[in-house]
């Protein structure tokens, strides 16, 4: 399978390397299977013969025209953590060759894959419109505001939709590369994951910091603070809206617009986050922790913890 990996100035070093390393490992381990899949023939392409990564390393590339021969185009992330600078880059002249390459690959029916901030380049090129996608959890409010036509689910680690596969934050590149291997051979993907000591991570929820998301909107940030001060109490949305000086409808819309979820779900996320913190840092029983975060029955909290983190309570203990 011919794979073209798009490199550009400022590309995230670990993202670029992860794709190569996982696919190289898969190639090295193919013969360990009775029925190995075809090898992955990986080529790094770019608008310039040499690009400088985010960490300052120089990477040689082949011309962008090689994408015409590719059976898969992979777009690693940009090493940029500032939302304003990220948007400026993916919408600016520096990324125009990359956007064109992505759009042409999509028009030709070539599958495309990307992770973390690289998903912004795909969205800017228009290939995610009307489709499901994920991105870095902490950039979800920015992504959702700029690309409203994309059905964003930042809780997922890997999302595939209409020939485009997206993955979550930073080291989600490993999950993305494993999904590429898994598409051809689940057995080989399992083997590679074991050798690289990589756990399956279907969700980003366990890594999400609710306050980092809420801070993108003043109303949501105020609601978060209001809820955190009352985690052990029943939460009333009308009371919260009254205390914050907004209508209940305005509060609901602000939460939905910023977080892509309901106020009730956000309150649950805050309670689960605090419960997980107490499990890691204290010796309190689950019953005591449940009461501290507003649940009468520990079984309810147990189910929510497993749902949000994908882990049993025992594994969350420090």
Where are these regions (language model features)?
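Extended, subdomain-level signal for the structured scaffold at the beginning of enzyme domains
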Residues: 1-112, 122-123, 189-190, 199-318
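Short loop/edge segments at beta-strand edges and connector loops
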Residues: 46, 154-156
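Short, well-ordered alpha-helix to beta-strand connector turns
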Residues: 70, 109, 130-131, 161
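Structural detector of well-ordered beta-strand residues that form the stable sheet scaffold
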Residues: 112-113, 134, 153
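Active-site segments of SGNH/GDSL-like serine hydrolases
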Residues: 119
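Short beta-strand and adjoining strand-loop segment in the mid-core
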Residues: 122-136
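An amphipathic alpha-helical interaction segment
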Residues: 137-140, 146, 151, 159-211
